[in-house]
Amino acid sequence: MSKDYGTPPENWREVYDEICKMKAKVVAPVDVQGCHTLGERNDPKKFRFQTLVALMLSSQTKDIVLGPTMRNLKEKLAGGLCLEDIQNIDEVSLNKLIEKVGFHNRKTIYLKQMARILSEKFQGDIPDTVEDLMTLPGVGPKMGYLCMSIAWNKTVGIGVDVHVHRICNLLHWCNTKTEEQTRAALQSWLPKELWFELNHTLVGFGQTICLPRGRRCDMCTLSSKGLCPSAFKEKSGITITKRKVKTIKRVKKRPASESPPLSPLSLPTDDLYYQSIEDKSLIKLEDLDPVDSISHMNEPLKKEPAADIDVDQKPPVAFHSTTKETRSLRRSKRVAKKSSQYFSQQSLQDIEDLV
């Protein structure tokens, strides 16, 4: 790893050549829909403007989305995407045309402001220095250096995006936290003739093999030759992740034949009488003669003749007997509740056994 700026890694050239060989065998999205392919080269001034627009739209946007968006602008705008088109179109319509790119609301404002600044300060053309380019809204160092290389054919710096920053740190070419630190570290030792092509090569390599998620180290020759310090080996290209599956413990159901026999409960056979209450926690039974209670069940019902009712006669006064015999016929709440709970539990247990 290069610890100090200006000190190149020992095997950087061998590593870079291997990346170029792998990159030559695949077609990456940047090869066909990158910013350097989206401008009309038959008109140099228009090409420079379209390149700047493409770079401004490229931030937080994939190339597979950037390409169709640029074609949409060229087809829908009257001048085929020139400075006058951006000046004349309203923000709502422009926002609709670029709605697929990331942060399209903010980029709509940037494009309108950029067109006004170019018309007022730069005679309708884009600036020819990085410093002036970065004065435009929404244009940073990466866009500025790439625009100088593509639009003006002047390479004054390395355009470092997330792919270049990530891969250079994986290769231990630098140990940096930001894209600007990576650019300064690379420019301190990388030959200047490789500054422009480095971005295109590493971006394509990062889009096809050294992916941000799920790096294909099994396909990378840097891994097989031991040139990548961050490579990891897998048995196959398929990564199997084991998950813990929660299992529900099933209780073995007991058949009804094995259920324990019900124990008989001795209940008083005396006549029971309960007064009705609101919560219905007591059992209300009919009054029966304790001696003839069983014999009455087998006898047929007898209809008694209706007695003559005297309208003027007053109804008898009801009274409660307090004799010992009457008190013994009353059943306490405790006994009633206990017997009710017993039968409820036995019934539920029998139902569970049957199910």
UniProtKB/Swiss-Prot annotation:
Biased composition (Polar residues): 338-349
Names of the cofactor(s): [4Fe-4S] cluster
Gene: nth1
Family matches, as Pfam families: HHH, HhH-GPD
Organism lineage: Eukaryota, Fungi, Dikarya, Ascomycota, Taphrinomycotina
Origin species: Schizosaccharomyces pombe (strain 972 / ATCC 24843)
Known catalytic reactions: 2'-deoxyribonucleotide-(2'-deoxyribose 5'-phosphate)-2'-deoxyribonucleotide-DNA = a 3'-end 2'-deoxyribonucleotide-(2,3-dehydro-2,3-deoxyribose 5'-phosphate)-DNA + a 5'-end 5'-phospho-2'-deoxyribonucleoside-DNA + H(+)
Region (Disordered): 303-355
Residues marked Important for catalytic activity (site): D161
UniProt feature coiled coil, ranges: none
Name of the protein in question: Endonuclease III homolog
Enzyme active site: K142 (nucleophile)
Positions with a binding annotation for [4Fe-4S] cluster: C210, C217, C220, C228
